[in-house]
């Protein structure tokens, strides 16, 4: 039993040792398992790490490959991109060149448009400037024309003023015999501007000739006097008024136009363009204002005794004649401007010698043979008788007439 017990004990001890061994083994196994597990885990981890490393390496390799591939791809892509970029750059360069060309074209167009616009603007500006110049020229012309018109108007006004400022004289006719200078002046004093009045008398007598003259300061007063006094009764008789003004300027124009030059000075004046109605006494009174008048002569036709349209006024000296010529040149006498000039002095000899077979000399004493008495001569010779008939039937001087003798029979009628 004891053996059995020992055996059982041994068995138990064996079992326990086995169990311990098993437990140890289990523990070892567990530890080993743990270690194995750890190792496995480590291995696993290592494997995992390796796998991971491998994977990483593979991944890295793959990555490297991929990177290489990607790099190659990227390189290819880069190359393609480069090519594309080159192409794009070339295209961009082309496009840029095209764009530049287009820009240049646009710039040229812009420049052309600018030039055209500038040319248009310049042309428009030039046209505007030309139009402005034309307008300015037109304005200048208008201003010049206006100035000329103003000058003409001012000159006309000056001439009118000068004409109005010049003294004027009116003729007063149909006066009463009893009216004298003072009476005539008083009748016109209410008009204003009266300088003086004079009544024309017959020479050597105190008898009025029925007319006179009234002098005014200017033409306006004279015209007013004619308007107001025409037909007015003075001393029971209606008077007649008319303008009688002097215009020396007109005669000066005539002298310039026709080249009239005065002759050598003398004490006698020649009066040309004299009215046929000119009165000798009126001429005497007019010229006596400028000097001592000796005589007034108005030649007439011997047959009709009508004036010839000219006359002579003789002064006592040459200075008075010069004064009268300067003052009265172009003076209106009976509404006609008279032309004055110095007259050559008349010869003071006793007369010329009468010519034979002609008229006697001017102023000669007695006419010659077969002549008439000279002009102003005492008695002309009696004209001779010419038996030869008229001058048409007479033979030339120094030759005898050759006439055929009558050889026919004479017939008589009973």
Swiss-Prot record:
Its main location: nucleus. Residues 27-44, 54-73, 118-128 have a biased composition (Low complexity). Signal peptide: none annotated. Gene3D superfamilies: 3.30.70.330. Induction: In response to low temperature (By cold-shock). Keywords: DNA-binding, Methylation, Nucleus, Phosphoprotein, Repeat, RNA-binding, rRNA processing, Stress response. InterPro entries: Euk_RNA-bind_prot (IPR050502), Gar2_RRM2 (IPR034276), Nucleotide-bd_a/b_plait_sf (IPR012677), RBD_domain_sf (IPR035979), RRM_dom (IPR000504). GO terms for biological process: chromosome organization; DNA recombination; maturation of SSU-rRNA; ribosomal small subunit assembly; rRNA processing. Residues 10-26, 78-87, 106-117, 134-144 have a biased composition (Basic and acidic residues). GO terms for molecular function: G-quadruplex DNA binding; mRNA binding; nuclear localization sequence binding; RNA binding; single-stranded telomeric DNA binding. It is found in: Nucleus; Nucleus, Nucleolus. The modification Asymmetric dimethylarginine is found at residues 357, 362, 366, 375, 379, 382. Belongs to the RRM GAR family. Present with 77400 molecules/cell in log phase SD medium. This is Nuclear localization sequence-binding protein. It comes from Saccharomyces cerevisiae (strain ATCC 204508 / S288c). The gene is NSR1.
């Amino acid at each position: 039993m004891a053996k059995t017990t020992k055996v059982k004990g041994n068995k138990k001890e064996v079992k326990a040792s086995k169990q311990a061994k098993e437990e140890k083994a289990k523990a070892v196994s567990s530890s080993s398992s743990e270690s194995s597990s750890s190792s496995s885990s480590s291995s696993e981890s290592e494997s995992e790490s390796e796998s991971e490393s491998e994977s990483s390496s593979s991944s890295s390799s793959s990555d490297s490959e991929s990177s290489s591939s990607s790099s190659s791809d990227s390189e290819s892509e880069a190359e393609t991109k480069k090519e594309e970029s080159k192409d794009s750059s070339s295209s961009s360069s082309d496009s840029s060149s095209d764009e530049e060309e287009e820009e240049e074209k646009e710039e040229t167009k812009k420049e052309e448009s600018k030039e055209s616009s500038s040319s248009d603007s310049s042309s428009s500006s030039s046209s505007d400037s030309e139009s402005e110049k034309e307008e300015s020229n037109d304005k200048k012309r208008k201003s010049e024309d206006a100035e000329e018109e103003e000058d003409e108007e001012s000159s006309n006004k000056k001439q009118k003023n000068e004409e109005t400022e010049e003294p004027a004289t009116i003729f007063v006719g149909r006066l009463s015999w009893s009216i004298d200078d003072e009476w005539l002046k008083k009748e016109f004093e209410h008009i204003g501007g009266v300088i003086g009045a004079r009544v024309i008398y017959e020479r050597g007598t105190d008898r009025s000739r029925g007319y006179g003259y009234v002098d005014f300061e200017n033409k306006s007063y004279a015209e007013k006097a004619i308007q107001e006094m025409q037909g007015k009764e003075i001393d029971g008789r209606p008077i007649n008024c008319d303008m009688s003004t002097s215009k020396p300027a007109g005669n000066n124009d005539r002298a310039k136009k026709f080249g009239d030059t005065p002759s050598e000075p003398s004490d006698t004046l020649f009066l040309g363009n004299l009215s046929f109605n000119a009165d000798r006494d009126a001429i005497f009174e007019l010229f006596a204002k400028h000097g001592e008048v000796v005589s007034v002569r108005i030649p007439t036709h011997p047959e009709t005794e009508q004036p010839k349209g000219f006359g002579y006024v003789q002064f006592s000296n040459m200075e008075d004649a010069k004064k009268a010529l300067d003052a009265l040149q172009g003076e209106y006498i009976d509404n006609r401007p008279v032309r004055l000039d110095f007259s050559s002095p008349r010869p003071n000899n006793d007369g010329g010698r009468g010519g034979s077979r002609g008229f006697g000399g001017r102023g000669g004493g007695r006419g010659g043979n077969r002549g008439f008495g000279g002009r102003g001569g005492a008695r002309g010779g009696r004209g001779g008788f010419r038996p030869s008939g008229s001058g048409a039937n007479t033979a030339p001087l120094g030759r005898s007439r050759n006439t055929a003798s009558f050889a026919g029979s004479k017939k008589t009628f009973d």
